[in-house]
Amino acid sequence: EEQVEARELGRSIDAYLDTLPRENRNIFLRRYWFGDSVKDIAKAFSLTQNAVSVRLNRMRGGLRTHLIKEGYYE
């Protein structure tokens, strides 16, 4: 049962990530999947570290809202 819930949560996260513009999705994945630093991501995308941090913060907020709507958080 836990494996089923984990798979469903993974699908919900993927569904959220699919709504993001490609660049933002790549930034999110590089930070939270591959563990790249904000500094390295900023260099790779020709952005400031602050711009990357702001985008990540907004995406985390969007993910939180999405997961609440899906019933994963209250």
Describe the predicted segments one by one.
Residues 27-31:
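A short pre-motif secondary-structure segment
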Residues 34-35:
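Flexible coil/turn residues that form the inter-helical turn or adjacent wing/linker of helix-turn-helix
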Residues 72-74:
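Intrinsically disordered, low-complexity basic tails/linkers immediately adjacent to helix-turn-helix/homeobox/MYB/SANT
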